[in-house]
C-alpha cells in the first residue's frame, strides 16, 4: 500500500479563519445578551456585518496574539471547539476564584444544560473583572503538568478547579452540554444560517450570521493543490484525509475547490468518525493525537475495525508506504501511533517556528504542501 494522508488546517487550508471564528465564539458566549451578556469594554459588533478589523481585534484580545493557541496546540489540542472550551472554562474558573476571595470564601456553582443557564451565570458574574488572555495562559501553565496531551489537559483543569467551584463539574468535560452549546455557536458563525439549518435541521440559537465558508483560504492556489492530488495518484499513491474537523466542515470547502471528487469518501476521516466510534464502543472520543482518525484514513472508515483502531492494534505492513502531511505535534504523534511517517508542513500556526519540534521528532519537513513530491522522491 502506498498512501499520502493530508491534514486540512494548516496544511491544505489556512487555520486563520477557524481561529477567527473561535475567537468570535468566545466573545459571543461572554458578551452577547443571547448568552452571558457580560459588559464589554469594546464596542459591540453586528454579526451580519462584522468587519475584518473587528475580527482581528477580537482575536487579538481573546487569544492573546495567538499565545493561547500555540500553548493548546503544543498540548495536542487541535480542535477549535476544544480550544474554545478550554478558554471558557478557565475564564469561569478565574472569575469564580475572584468571587470566592471577595465573598470571604463562598463558592460559586454552575449548571449549563441550555443557553438560558448561561444568562443566569452571567447575572451572577456581573461586576467581576474579566480575566485577560495572559491570566488564562498563566493558569494553564501552572495547573497543567508538563507532558499532558489532549483530553488529559481538561482532566487536570477539572481537578484543579474543584477547590474553587462548588457542585457538579461535569460541564467542564469535553462534549458536556456546555461544550455542545458553544460548539453550536461556533457552527453558526462558521456555517452561516442557511447552511446551519440545512445540516443541523434547526435554527441557530443566535441567528443572523452569513458564515465564513466563502472566506476559506487555500495554503497554495487551489488548482495547484488539485494538481498535486492528481500527480500523486498518477505515481501510484492513494490519497486520504485525517482531520480534526467535523465532516460537513471538511466537505463544504473541498467541494467548493473541486478537491472532493479526487478522494474516496471511505478514507476521508474526520472528527465525526471519532464521535461515531465513541457512540458505538461507549468509550472516549479518540480524536488527535490518538491514532484513530489516522487509522480510518489508512484502512477505511469501517465500523467493524473501530475497536482495533481504538486499541491501536491494526497497523500497516512493514513494506507499506504511508505518509501523513501535518503541521502540528499531534499529527506527528498520531501518525506515528498509527504506523505512518509524518511529513511536516510549515504553513500552520507556528510557521517556521515548528522546525525545532519537527527536527527533535526526526520528521522531514517542507515549506508548503505542494513541495511534498520532491520529498517523496527522496524516500
Predicted segments, located by residue:
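Active-site neighborhood of HAD-like aspartate-dependent phosphohydrolases
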Residues: 1-62, 82-85
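Substrate-recognition element of Asp-dependent hydrolases with the DxDx(T/V) motif
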Residues: 22, 74-75, 128, 133-178, ...
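Non-catalytic, alpha-helical, charged scaffold/linker segments
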Residues: 43-189
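Substrate-recognition "cap/lid" segment bordering the active-site pocket of phosphatases
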Residues: 205-209, 213-214, 218-226, 230, ...
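Surface-exposed amphipathic alpha-helices with a cationic face
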Residues: 229-233, 298, 332-336
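Acidic, Mg2+-coordinating phosphoryl-transfer loop and its flanking beta/alpha structural elements
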Residues: 244, 323-365
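Short acidic-hydrophobic, aromatic-tinged amphipathic segments that line or gate anion-handling sites
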Residues: 269-270, 363-372
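Short amphipathic alpha-helix with an adjacent loop that forms part of the alpha/beta core around
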Residues: 371-379
Amino acid at each position: 500500500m502506498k498512501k499520502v494522508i493530508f491534514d486540512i488546517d494548516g496544511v491544505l487550508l489556512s487555520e486563520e479563519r477557524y481561529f477567527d471564528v473561535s475567537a468570535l465564539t468566545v466573545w459571543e458566549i461572554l458578551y452577547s445578551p443571547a448568552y452571558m451578556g457580560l459588559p464589554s469594554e469594546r464596542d459591540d459588533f453586528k454579526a451580519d456585518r462584522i468587519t475584518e478589523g473587528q475580527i482581528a481585534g477580537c482575536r487579538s484580545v481573546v487569544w492573546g496574539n495567538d499565545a493561547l493557541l500555540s500553548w493548546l496546540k503544543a498540548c495536542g489540542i487541535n480542535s477549535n471547539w476544544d480550544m474554545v472550551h478550554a478558554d471558557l472554562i478557565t475564564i469561569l474558573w478565574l472569575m469564580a476564584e475572584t468571587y470566592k476571595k471577595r465573598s470571604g470564601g463562598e463558592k460559586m456553582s454552575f449548571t449549563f444544560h441550555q443557553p438560558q443557564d448561561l444568562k443566569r451565570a452571567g447575572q451572577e458574574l456581573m461586576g467581576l473583572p474579566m480575566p485577560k488572555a495572559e491570566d488564562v495562559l498563566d493558569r494553564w501553565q501552572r495547573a497543567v503538568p508538563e507532558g499532558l496531551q489532549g483530553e488529559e489537559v481538561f482532566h487536570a483543569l477539572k481537578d484543579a478547579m474543584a477547590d474553587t467551584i462548588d457542585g457538579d463539574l461535569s460541564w467542564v468535560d469535553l462534549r458536556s452540554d456546555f461544550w455542545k452549546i458553544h460548539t453550536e455557536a461556533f457552527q453558526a458563525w462558521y456555517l452561516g444560517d442557511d447552511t446551519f439549518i440545512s445540516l443541523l435541521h434547526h435554527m441557530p440559537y443566535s441567528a443572523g450570521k452569513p458564515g465564513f465558508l466563502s472566506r476559506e483560504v487555500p495554503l497554495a492556489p487551489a488548482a495547484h493543490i488539485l494538481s498535486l492530488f492528481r500527480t500523486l495518484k498518477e505515481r501510484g499513491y492513494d490519497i486520504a484525509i485525517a482531520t480534526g474537523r467535523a465532516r460537513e466542515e471538511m466537505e463544504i470547502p473541498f467541494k467548493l475547490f473541486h478537491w472532493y471528487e479526487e478522494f474516496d469518501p471511505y478514507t476521508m476521516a474526520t472528527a465525526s468518525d471519532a464521535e461515531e466510534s465513541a457512540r458505538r464502543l461507549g468509550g472516549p472520543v479518540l480524536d488527535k493525537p490518538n491514532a484513530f482518525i489516522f487509522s480510518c484514513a489508512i484502512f477505511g472508515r469501517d465500523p467493524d475495525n473501530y475497536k482495533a483502531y481504538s486499541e491501536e492494534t491494526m497497523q500497516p505492513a512493514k513494506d507499506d508506504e504511508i505518509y501523513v502531511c501535518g503541521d502540528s505535534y499531534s499529527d506527528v504523534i498520531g501518525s506515528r501511533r498509527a504506523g505512518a511517517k509524518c511529513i511536516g508542513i510549515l504553513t500552520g500556526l507556528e510557521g517556521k517556528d515548528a522546525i525545532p519540534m519537527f527536527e527533535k521528532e526526526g520528521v522531514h519537513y517542507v515549506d508548503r504542501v505542494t513541495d511534498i513530491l520532491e520529498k517523496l522522491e527522496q524516500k
